[in-house]
Amino acid sequence: VLSPADKTNVKAAWGKVGAHAGDYGAEALERMFLSFPTTKTYFPHFDLSHGSAZVKGHGKKVAKALTBAVZHLDDMPNALSALSBLHAHKLRVBPVBFKLLNHCLLVTLAABFPSZFTPAVHASVDKFLASVSTVLTSKYR
C-alpha cells in the first residue's frame, strides 16, 4: 500500500518524466531486452534494435499505462483492468517479466534523473511499480 508520501514521490517523479514518458518507456524496454534476452520472446515480429519504431511505440504504451496508474493511484485495479486482462489471457506474459521491466524502469529513471531520484523516491517508485505488477498479474489465477 502506498503511503501519502509515496504517492507524492511517485507523482513528482512521473511529473519529471512528463511529455517524454514514451522515450523513457522505450529506453527501459531496450534495457530489458539487452539485460534479459528471454523477454524478447513476446516480440518476435518487432525490430528490437536501438531506436526502432516498434520499441518506441511499445514504450509509449508502457508509459501510457503507467501514467494511467499514476493518475489513479487509489484505484489502479479498475484503471488497469483491461490491460490486466490482455496480459493474463491473450499475451500470457510471465509475471516475472514485469519485475524485470520494473527493474529496468528504475535504472532508467535513476540514470536520467540522478539528483531527483533520491533513496526515498526510489523506494516509492519501486513500491508503485510493484503495485502495478500485482494488478497486472491479478487475473492470472
Swiss-Prot record:
Transmembrane regions: none
Keywords: Heme, Iron, Metal-binding, Oxygen transport, Transport
Tissue expression remark: Red blood cells.
Binding site for heme b: 87
GO biological process: cellular oxidant detoxification; hydrogen peroxide catabolic process
One Pfam family matching this protein: Globin
Annotated GO CC locations: haptoglobin-hemoglobin complex; hemoglobin complex
Cysteine pairings via disulfide bonds: none
Domain of life: Eukaryota
PROSITE patterns hit by this protein: GLOBIN (PS01033)
Domain called Globin: residue spans: 1-141
GO molecular function, one term: iron ion binding
PANTHER family to which the protein is assigned, alphabetical: HEMOGLOBIN FAMILY MEMBER, HEMOGLOBIN SUBUNIT ALPHA-3
Further remarks about this protein from its record: Two kinds of alpha-3 chains were found in one gorilla. An Asx replaces one Ser (at position 131, 133, or 138) in the tryptic peptide comprising residues 128-139.
Stated family: Belongs to the globin family.
Function of the protein: Involved in oxygen transport from the lung to the various peripheral tissues.
Quaternary structure annotation from Swiss-Prot or TrEMBL: Heterotetramer of two alpha chains and two beta chains.
Name the UniProt record assigns to this protein: Hemoglobin subunit alpha-3
